[in-house]
Amino acid sequence: MLREYKTVREIVGPLMLVEKVEGVKYNELVEIETGTGEIRRGQVLEVNGDKALVQLFEGSTGLNINDCKVRFVGKSIELGVSIDMLGRVFDGLGRPRDKGPMIIPEKRLDINGNPINPTARDYPSEFIQTGISAIDGLNTLVRGQKLPIFSGSGLPHAQLAAQIARQAKVLGSDSKFAVVFAAMGITFEEADYFISDFRRTGAIDRSVLFINLANDPAIERIATPRMALTCAEFLAYEKEMHVLVIMTDMTNYCEALREVSAARKEVPGRRGYPGYLYTDLATIYERAGRIKGRKGSITQIPILTMPEDDKTHPIPDLTGYITEGQIILSRDLYRKGIYPPIDVLPSLSRLKDKGIGQGKTREDHADLMNQLFASYARGKQAKELAVILGEAALSDTDKLYAKFADEFEARYVAQREDEDRSIEETLAIGWDLLTILPRAELKRVRDEYIDKYLPEKGE
């Protein structure tokens, strides 16, 4: 039997303190009935004796401590999941936002999930083709990996996220592929862009969207990624699908976490973020992976905007510790008109070696990748030298490397927003670029691969 309390002592920001409670549990779902009969939801953050601290998902605007009725439901927050969620748009708490009917759930799952037993985890493998050369060719995404994108304010990470969601696929697999898209704290224009882009391209049919707008309560953002991951776990482990989870913008999520921490008067950590930020982010990122004996998998691409483009900021810093690499967007490339402005040199996919090579992409992929990295790095050095000493100071070989760097950015990194390159096209562009350099400079590629794949100059 549900007990109803009218003993609300205090409301501060998104938090409510309820007194004289019994049998209340941490993370328990709470229903708050206002004086007008409106029902709002919350979650127990802390229990101390007969007092419970409740986090309000819809905010505290309009609440009066004298006429609130609080009910503790006896279970944690759950999401009703079903295969019918594919093709639908929900808000940050899993309620339909697309004016469609409510989902009839096949089952209800706790949004906090269950940790995967480390011994039951299967090592990430298998190449995921995103259709973007700078990722597929140089910083390969592998099924079961968590690979974040570090962006900056004003950079086209929204377009990149939509493009990956449209184009991503596992080659040669008979399992179905799905995309779960979680957006936190985005503007109405961004939400409209995502929804219309998914519908226009038909990507909506294999996608589930959870959208928390900037004018929605900030506290709702804490639940949004967990709603998305709960849906992803159902599709992956119950329906045997390969699921790609794209979460944007994790910076907004962390700001919401800081807001709740400040309201609780907790001792702040770096830059005012709570000391448990690392642990909290890990509860989200570590829900990616594969399980032995299961066909399905969850691959994550969290996207975050680095405040002031600072890689040492706590959010990108801690994210980098938990995840398996990072894709970094460059403001300099963006100013040159290059899309996507992926800076390939500081970017890294730690598991790329597990998803490339014979039987996965192509035998020459690893050698070609190493040669492109080395040549582009030397080309950038040559261009920097030319700025200081003048182009006349460069050797003929350095001039070729400088030309290679420009061509690499213009032809390999840059591509249209609607351009879906196969891995064969990406590798072909890479080999074509290497014709700019003398064969003697191709020291990182085996001779048999050069003979087999390097086109003749002038072809």
Swiss-Prot record:
One of its GO terms (biological process) is proton motive force-driven plasma membrane ATP synthesis. The gene is atpB. InterPro entries: ATP-synt_VA_C (IPR055190), ATPase_a/bsu_AS (IPR020003), ATPase_F1/V1/A1_a/bsu_N (IPR004100), ATPase_F1/V1/A1_a/bsu_nucl-bd (IPR000194), P-loop_NTPase (IPR027417), V-ATPase_su_B/beta (IPR022879). Belongs to the ATPase alpha/beta chains family. SUPFAM superfamilies: P-loop containing nucleoside triphosphate hydrolases. Keywords: ATP synthesis, Hydrogen ion transport, Ion transport, Transport. PROSITE patterns: ATPASE_ALPHA_BETA. This is V-type ATP synthase beta chain.
